[in-house]
Regions:
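C-terminal catalytic core of Y-nucleophile DNA break-rejoin enzymes
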Residues: 136-156, 171-198
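Conserved tyrosine-mediated DNA breakage-rejoining catalytic core shared by Y-recombinases
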Residues: 111-156, 162
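Short, basic (Lys/Arg/His-rich) helix/loop patches that form interaction surfaces
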Residues: 83, 192-245, 252
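DNA breakage-rejoining catalytic core of tyrosine-based enzymes
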Residues: 54-76, 139-149, 165-172
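A short, glycine-centered helix-capping/turn motif at helix boundaries
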Residues: 27, 37, 98-112, 237-238, ...
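Catalytic-site neighborhood detector that most strongly recognizes the C-terminal catalytic loop/helix
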Residues: 240, 247-272
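Basic, Lys/Arg- and aromatic-enriched nucleic-acid-binding interface segment
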Residues: 73-106
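N-terminal core-binding DNA-recognition domain of tyrosine recombinases/integrases
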Residues: 1-61, 81-84
Length: 276
């Protein structure tokens, strides 16, 4: 604890999911003690009123994402930065576009011991469709379908680096290059700083134009919100199975969390209720 004073009692509370996880860990520990003959029974399994500790929610947690207005200002900020300093910020613009349009995680843009993202991981199939190969969460390899707009973004980025319009098979050029030195970016912290710069510029513009609430909420945003935003927008008009596979979700149930049509309709039906 950083302060000289002791933490205030009651200043922190575990969430229901944290309590549930804690009970699971304790239950496993007590089962081990039973196997080693230290205990005869598992006290956690004897908690008949677990609902006393775990709050059940009627609805699922809301996905943290940018609003259409916030995204317009964020990508607009990246475009302005690229126009003012292309040597540095054409890369910034590409990063923002890739995180949003291909639902990439931050770890999928940087060089790691398990994967080195390269230009050659953009591939064209025999039908002329472009795909991006990546290795994501759980060390799972997946192909992401590449839209025409993302292909245009790729062409622009490559030309800013003095490369041909689209990559050839096996192109070893790093996907996200260092502006100083050679090779690809290896630090997720550097990507976070790049994205945060766009968020800060967008928040400044939003506040300047009177969108104070949107600017304040943008202050809470993280890099991962861009992935959530891209998925949330696409699931409105793409088959959820297609979005699921591009996002690398383990099941359609995860993708379903991004569909808020029923929630919007529910609120719309309540909007004009009268009290008196």
């Amino acid at each position: 604890y950083s302060s000289a004073a002791s933490p205030e009692e009651g200043g922190y509370a575990l969430s229901s999911s944290s309590i549930q996880s804690l009970l699971g860990v304790l239950s496993s520990f007590f089962n081990y003690l039973i196997q080693e003959s230290y205990l005869e029974s598992n006290p956690v399994s004897q908690l008949r009123q677990k609902s006393k500790f775990i709050r059940k929610s009627q609805s699922q947690a809301q996905i943290r994402r940018l609003s259409p207005l916030q995204w317009d200002y964020v990508i607009g900020a990246a475009e302005k930065m690229a126009a003012n300093d292309p040597a540095v910020h054409e890369r910034t613009l590409f990063i923002m576009q890739a995180l949003f349009a291909m639902y990439l995680r931050i770890s999928e843009l940087v060089v790691t011991p398990r994967w080195t993202p390269q230009m050659g991981h953009f591939r064209q199939d025999t039908e002329g469709n472009w795909w991006f190969l990546t290795v994501g969460k759980g060390n799972k390899e997946r192909e992401v379908s590449v839209s025409d707009a993302m292909l245009d973004a790729l062409r622009r980025y490559r030309r800013s680096r003095g490369l041909s319009g689209l990559p050839a098979i096996g192109d070893p050029a790093p996907l996200v290059h260092k502006t100083r030195g050679s090779g690809g970016i290896t630090s997720t912290r550097q990507i976070r700083l790049i994205v945060q710069k766009c968020f800060d510029e967008a928040a400044y513009s939003l506040r300047k134009e009177g969108f104070t609430d949107d600017a304040d909420r943008l202050g809470e945003a993280t890099v991962h919100w861009l992935r959530h935003t891209g998925i949330s927008e696409d699931v409105k008009h793409r088959p959820r199975e297609h979005v699921r596979d591009d996002a690398g979700h383990g099941s359609s149930a995860i993708t379903d969390r991004y569909i808020d049509v029923e929630r919007a309709e529910r609120h719309a039906s309540a909007r004009n209720k009268v009290i008196k």
